[in-house]
Every structure is written in C-alpha cells, then in structure tokens.
Amino acid sequence: MITTSVTEAAECLQQGQVLAYPTEAVWGLGCDPFNEQAFQKILELKQRPIEKGVILLAGHISQVEHLLTSLPQTTQQEIIDCWTNHQPSERATTWLLPADQHIPSWIKGEHPLVAVRVTTHPLCVALCNAFHGFIVSTSANPSGQEPAHSLQDACQYFGSQLNYLNGDLGQSQQPSRIINALTGEVIRP
C-alpha cells in the first residue's frame, strides 16, 4: 500500500506492519518498536544483523522524557535544546541515551544505550503523534546499498513487501549525527 494518510500509516504500524517513510535526509523503515515480529521483518528486509541496533524516532520530547531522567540536569537541557532548536536545513541529531526497562533488547542490539531522535520533520512528527509514541527508524536500503532518497528508490528496493507513506524528504543532506549523551563522544559526525 502507498498512502499519503498519516492515519493509515499509523494504523499499519499498530497492526504490526513495516512502513517506509521520508525523514529529514533519507527514506526510513519503521515499525512498532515493541513488536518483535515487525522488527525482525525490518532486519530481514535490510539483511541487517540484530547486533547493530536501530534508532527510535519520536515526534515530541514527552515521548522520550523517561529516557532522560537518569542524566544530569545540564545534559538533559542540552539534549532538549538540541532537539527543540533544530532548524529544518540543519543536520538532525540522534542521542545515545540510557535505556530503561521498557526498551526491548532487540532495539539496542549489542549496545548498552539506545539511539533516540526527536524529529522536526513535519510528516515524521505527525506519524509519531498519530502512533502515540516513538517508532523504529533505520535507513530504507538493504545493507551495503545507498539509502533510498525517493518513494521510487524505496519501491525498487522492497516492492510490495511493505507499506509506504509518501511525502517529501526534509532539507538535510546527511543522515543524523550521533552523540553519546553520557560521554559527549560524537559517534557519527
């Protein structure tokens, strides 16, 4: 199914299906992070090892606040400021945060932290809000291939194996940078 309806796309996620959708820079694959079967389908489609982990994408700070509480107040504020002051033309930032007991182990892979990004991309914000929480976000491509930059690219990779939320990419030219919130280390510049 190809849709432009955020409501239909959120229903696909709620039904345990995989969805391709445009993000800030490239097309992503998403699912309900708490649905292991849907998550395994993404790994199968991407031919990606589970050890690598994936990003959780949220539409609002309130969807991830519980993951910030163990951090020092100054670090919490830095992360919130980074997400809330993000400009559409700027590169997005994903933070590695301490995972709480509610984050499934398959999301983190072999890592002790969970990768989280609060997006300002309008379609992604609407999707996360319609889904009422964060979703899995990993680039829409088989491992070793270039990420999809259009609906056509995503369809060429995956055909009818999943659903598509059609819309515009954001203005960023690069995937998000990744920063470890505990150490400040930039993992992906």
UniProtKB/Swiss-Prot annotation:
<comment type="similarity">
    <text>Belongs to the SUA5 family. TsaC subfamily.</text>
</comment>
<dbReference type="GO" id="GO:0006450">
    <property type="term" value="P:regulation of translational fidelity"/>
</dbReference>
<protein>
    <recommendedName>
        <fullName>Threonylcarbamoyl-AMP synthase</fullName>
        <ecNumber>2.7.7.87</ecNumber>
    </recommendedName>
</protein>
<keyword id="KW-0819">tRNA processing</keyword>
<dbReference type="GO" id="GO:0000049">
    <property type="term" value="F:tRNA binding"/>
</dbReference>
<dbReference type="GO" id="GO:0003725">
    <property type="term" value="F:double-stranded RNA binding"/>
</dbReference>
<dbReference type="Pfam" id="PF01300">
    <property type="entry name" value="Sua5_yciO_yrdC"/>
</dbReference>
<dbReference type="GO" id="GO:0005737">
    <property type="term" value="C:cytoplasm"/>
</dbReference>
<keyword id="KW-0808">Transferase</keyword>
<dbReference type="InterPro" id="IPR006070">
    <property type="entry name" value="Sua5-like_dom"/>
</dbReference>
<keyword id="KW-0548">Nucleotidyltransferase</keyword>
<dbReference type="GO" id="GO:0005524">
    <property type="term" value="F:ATP binding"/>
</dbReference>
<dbReference type="InterPro" id="IPR050156">
    <property type="entry name" value="TC-AMP_synthase_SUA5"/>
</dbReference>
<dbReference type="InterPro" id="IPR023535">
    <property type="entry name" value="TC-AMP_synthase"/>
</dbReference>
<keyword id="KW-0963">Cytoplasm</keyword>
<keyword id="KW-0547">Nucleotide-binding</keyword>
<keyword id="KW-0067">ATP-binding</keyword>
<dbReference type="InterPro" id="IPR017945">
    <property type="entry name" value="DHBP_synth_RibB-like_a/b_dom"/>
</dbReference>
<feature type="domain" description="YrdC-like">
    <location>
        <begin position="3"/>
        <end position="189"/>
    </location>
</feature>
<dbReference type="GO" id="GO:0002949">
    <property type="term" value="P:tRNA threonylcarbamoyladenosine modification"/>
</dbReference>
<dbReference type="GO" id="GO:0061710">
    <property type="term" value="F:L-threonylcarbamoyladenylate synthase"/>
</dbReference>
<comment type="function">
    <text>Required for the formation of a threonylcarbamoyl group on adenosine at position 37 (t(6)A37) in tRNAs that read codons beginning with adenine. Catalyzes the conversion of L-threonine, HCO(3)(-)/CO(2) and ATP to give threonylcarbamoyl-AMP (TC-AMP) as the acyladenylate intermediate, with the release of diphosphate.</text>
</comment>
